[in-house]
UniProtKB/Swiss-Prot annotation:
This is Choline transport system permease protein OpuBD. One of its GO terms (cellular component) is plasma membrane. InterPro entries: ABC_transp_perm/SBD, MetI-like, MetI-like_sf. Induction: Repressed by GbsR. Belongs to the binding-protein-dependent transport system permease family. CysTW subfamily. Changing residue 50 to Y: In strain: ATCC 6633 / PCI 219. It comes from the Bacteria. It is found in: Cell membrane. It comes from Bacillus subtilis (strain 168). Residues 22-202 form the ABC transmembrane type-1 domain. Its main location: membrane. Involved in a high affinity multicomponent binding-protein-dependent transport system for choline; probably responsible for the translocation of the substrate across the membrane.
Amino acid sequence: MNVLEQLMTYYAQNGSYVMDEFGRHFLMSAYGVLFAAVVGVPAGILIAHFRRLSAWVFAVTNVIQTIPALAMLAVLMLVMGLGANTVILSLFLYSLLPIIRNTYTGIISIEHAYLESGKAMGMTKFQVLRMVELPLALSVIMAGLRTALVIAIGITAIGTFVGAGGLGDMIVRGSNATNGTAIILAGAIPTAVMAVGADLLMAWLERALSPVKKKRTGAKHVQSAA
């Protein structure tokens, strides 16, 4: 059998296993990015308002980003042991930089006139943040989440080395087999599909949440009503 036939046979015989590992892979990636968003978005907002802190925060997150993923997993494994939690923590650390950076960029790029208009209407600082800054910066923040999620999906593939499972299991198993090209592809193809699908979904959300698009949509509704 050629590689394509071997691949189809593998999927036919191990379809439920592949789907289980696909779900496990995605959940680890999503949890890592979600936890990073819970920390990274407030951190980005904070350093956007207290810019003296930005150099320190970016210095730390840039250093984290330079550590090879396998080395990070090895160090965290010594502390947390084997399993998915080690991978999720490493994804959390790697996702901080794109999320914090985009949140910071989105907030500081808002025109000062919008902020002054909010203050002139009697808004508190929290109301300006909630009703002016976050809506205008949301598409940029989503771009950071998009980058973080795609990176996380790739890093999760090597989580198999710390016993986390995921699609990387098939890639490693195929690498160790005598004629394992089909097994490698059985793990690599779903990983690529997941990354591309996540990127397209997040790109759509980014466009949907863009304030420019909302403004144009609102203008069309006004014109049609007129």
